[in-house]
Amino acid sequence: MPQVFKIGPYWVYFWANEQDPLEPVHVHIALGAPRENATKVWITRRGKCLLCNNNSKIPETVLRNMMRIIEARSSEVIEKWKGFFGTADFFC
């Protein structure tokens, strides 16, 4: 799975086996190795994060801090998404 970056022991990554049609820009977050059905965060047009689910059961304060970092690096996330998937649509 394409790793976008790491935040401490957590991976922030794209799941390469996305559905067709391609879902809007989002990242998954998991402790240790990437895995299917990990925590999912949508990236909005304005670079904000919206929590889709917390399947990885990341503690709330940790997740909130990670989402702030992802927002600060959202342009990097979007560019990497476009580079990997060839297009970028947004949830909102």
Regions found by a protein language model. Name each.
Residues 53-92:
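Well-ordered alpha/beta subsegment
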Residues 4, 16, 71-75:
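Alpha-helical interaction segments
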